[in-house]
Amino acid sequence: MAFNEDVGALVIDNGSGMCKAGFAGDDAPRAVFPSIVGRPRHQGVMVGMGQKDSYVGDEAQSKRGILTLKYPIEHGIVTNWDDMEKIWHHTFYNELRVAPEEHPVLLTEAPLNPKANREKMTQIVFETFNSPAMYVAIQAVLSLYASGRTTGIVLDSGDGVTHTVPIYEGYALPHAILRLDMAGRDLTDYLMKILTERGYSFTTTAEREIVRDIKEKLCYVALDFEQEMSNAASSSALEKTYELPDGQVITIGNERFRCPEALFQPNFLGLESVGIHETTYNSIMKCDLDIRKDLYANTVLSGGSTMYPGIADRMQKEISALAPSTMKIKIVAPPERKYSVWIGGSILASLSTFQQMWISKQEYDESGPAIVHRKCF
């Protein structure tokens, strides 16, 4: 199918925490906003404000005091389609200011996304938004493309879920994908808890956002946790201060590395699962012997919860301890990894060789939503 070359494709990466959207060929998303939909708690509390029945993204975030906030994407999977439609509508009309019926749309999906979900996504894009063409790509695969590779294992950790996804020659290997229901949101909650132990109280959803900011600005991963704990106990060199919106200044010490340590020791959160290093190793071990070497040498970090300073060195150390002693291990942590899923989508959708891969409206009309399984894999 030949598109008018000047009409750029749209790339939308829907994460549990943030939606990243923009134009294929750009090197960064134009719009990044929270994946939330808010509805007024009390009818008519803002008389004459021209009150809407729902708010999306930053506007919902700023009016959170009078709204009930919902996340339509939980653990990477869309669970509320009405709200998801609102987020897409907001993306097209308010953030990107485009007419969806004029642009092909590339959407992303979580690894192991249920079949019915991919079909529903496809149906909404064609029937509600009348797009001329669309494609659904697996998030981790796009991150790998963004790093300039087609074979490797991606550790993708965002706000709602963490996956380890082995990929060979551009195809994810579903039998070896592992999912960990522990990600950024859990780390924020954990930091709220351990700051409370220090005597600072953070309880409301509004205060959770403050703690998320503290986490993003001050947390790091220790290379040796026990050693770091004793360093923190014997000196105040690791302490940092943070000014709260009301002007109060708080001090944070070992919490800085205790919080993200939960990625390696989920028992800190009361979870039974193994850490991200062991999950990555287990994922590699589920793959064919012949490709393991390529996976160890191309371990790519992706997503906002891999942004902690020190995480790549720690992964290198932990995986080296698990792998055969002669194995070459390389952890790739691109500086732009917070957006590498989106960037990979931008690269893919602008390749000339990709243009025949789009599902066209015509193909959809002939075959229905199931076409997505034949054309996107």
Swiss-Prot record:
PROSITE patterns: ACTINS_1, ACTINS_2, ACTINS_ACT_LIKE. Its EC number is 3.6.4.-. One of its GO terms (cellular component) is cytoskeleton. It holds the Pfam family Actin. Gene3D superfamilies: 3.30.420.40, Actin, Chain A, domain 4. Keywords: ATP-binding, Cytoplasm, Cytoskeleton, Hydrolase, Nucleotide-binding. SMART domains: ACTIN. GO terms for molecular function: ATP binding; hydrolase activity. Its main location: cytoplasm. It comes from the Eukaryota. Transmembrane segments: none annotated. It is found in: Cytoplasm, Cytoskeleton. It catalyses: ATP + H2O = ADP + phosphate + H(+). Actins are highly conserved proteins that are involved in various types of cell motility and are ubiquitously expressed in all eukaryotic cells. Belongs to the actin family. This is Actin-3. It comes from Dibothriocephalus dendriticus.
